[in-house]
């Protein structure tokens, strides 16, 4: 694809992230790379409610973090962020009060155009449309006035529900799944990859396996944070069923949210190898070590609204991708992956066996996945969509 690059010497885009210690940072960094490809000046700015950045940003990308606090201290944190939010275009990541809410205030005060990106249905984490806040007067009092009261958290689902009603106030919306497009509208900008960096021709799989201490093992890789809806347990049950001593599931990065990782290790530790999170530039070297990339999403509201980045990880690196028939996944992979029913360890086990029995054939399918990724999910493909959005602001 030939991309027309336009010079934007004075045009700065501020990507506003609700919590840089959470998963939203990854989408922000990806969109930042796309905007840099279009020659915009990029700055990522957001609150930090945890101890450290969730993901290591691409080198040379400017990132500003403001300590995140609960109400009433959050008013001061917001003021600090608003004072430093100086992009010519404001690009809010996720419809949350801490990103989109702050960005709306900036838009109203400054008149600067505002784009909203959605890569999740935020309310799906709480049950979707069925979620209601119906406290007793006593509970409401506690939620507001107690030091750790629920309503003191700036992104409480009640506030998220309110702010979803303001989505139309954005000048433009970008989304990454059909589910979100049907619900909120917007322009499709997939969770793609820089296929020049993620190029399997630059890496030797055997050398990568040796570097990470994985030689002699057959590697299934899950690059990301395990959560119950992501189905990692189904892969581990499949490995238990196969009971072949050289099979391992390598989890890269782990979960910053809770102790779910430890629960997995406690139950299935013999099958798991954990690798630490790494900069995006190092990730292809890690992925090269895999024989199979697993994306075993379960059929939940949350999963249906997502475009798992792990898909484009595996596709870009020409790996066999084993995933489930959930949401957009079949359409993203086309005929280039291996699909099973969600929550079906038996089918996962069968496909693992099938892939390793015909590994040469599986790797050919992986190469077709890369070709598809270059065509549809590369940074260039994302940039083309995003350029059309920005040109209409």
Q: Which residues make up each language-model segment?
A:
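Conserved donor-binding/catalytic core segment of Leloir-type glycosyltransferases
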Residues: 213-230, 236-239, 250
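Acidic anion/phosphate-binding donor-loop and adjacent secondary structure
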Residues: 193-211
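Conserved acidic donor-binding segment of nucleotide-sugar-dependent glycosyltransferases
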Residues: 335-345, 354-360
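Nucleotide-activated donor-binding/catalytic signature segment of Leloir-type glycosyltransferases, i.e.
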Residues: 261-284
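Nucleotide-sugar-dependent
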Residues: 97, 230, 279-286, 291-315, ...
């Amino acid at each position: 694809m030939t991309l027309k690059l336009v010079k934007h010497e004075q045009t700065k885009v501020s990507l506003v992230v609700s919590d840089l210690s959470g998963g939203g940072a990854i989408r922000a960094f990806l969109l930042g790379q796309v905007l840099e490809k279009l020659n915009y000046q990029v700055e990522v700015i957001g609150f930090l409610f945890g101890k450290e950045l969730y993901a290591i940003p691409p080198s040379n990308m400017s990132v500003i973090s403001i300590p995140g606090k609960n109400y009433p201290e959050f008013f001061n944190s917001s003021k600090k962020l608003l004072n430093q939010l100086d992009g010519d275009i404001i690009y809010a990541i996720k419809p949350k009060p801490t990103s989109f809410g702050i960005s709306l205030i900036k838009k109203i005060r400054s008149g600067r155009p505002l784009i909203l990106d959605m890569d999740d249905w935020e309310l799906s984490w709480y049950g979707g449309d069925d979620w209601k806040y119906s406290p007793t007067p006593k509970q409401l009092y506690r939620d507001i006035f107690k030091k750790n009261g629920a309503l003191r958290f700036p992104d409480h689902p009640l506030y998220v529900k309110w702010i979803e009603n303001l989505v139309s106030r954005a000048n433009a919306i970008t989304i990454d799944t059909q589910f979100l497009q049907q619900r909120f509208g917007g322009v499709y900008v997939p969770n793609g990859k820089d296929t020049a960096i993620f190029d399997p021709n630059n890496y030797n799989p055997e050398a990568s396996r040796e570097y990470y201490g994985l030689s002699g093992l057959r590697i299934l890789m899950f690059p990301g944070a395990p959560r119950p809806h992501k189905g990692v347990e189904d892969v581990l049950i499949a490995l238990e069923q196969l009971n072949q001593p050289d099979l391992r599931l390598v989890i890269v990065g782990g979960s910053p949210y809770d102790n779910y990782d430890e629960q997995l290790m406690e139950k299935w530790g013999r099958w798991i190898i954990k690798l630490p999170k790494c900069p995006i530039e190092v990730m292809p070297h890690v992925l090269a070590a895999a024989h199979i990339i697993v994306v075993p999403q379960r059929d939940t509201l949350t999963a249906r609204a997502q475009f798992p980045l792990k898909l484009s990880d595996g596709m870009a690196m020409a790996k066999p991708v084993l995933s489930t028939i959930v949401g957009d996944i079949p359409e993203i992979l086309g005929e280039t992956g291996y699909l099973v029913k969600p929550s079906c360890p038996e089918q996962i086990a069968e496909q693992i066996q099938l892939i390793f029995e015909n590994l040469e054939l599986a790797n050919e399918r992986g190469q077709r996945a890369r070709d598809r990724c270059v065509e549809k999910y590369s940074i260039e493909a994302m940039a083309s969509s995003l350029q059309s959005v920005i040109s209409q602001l």
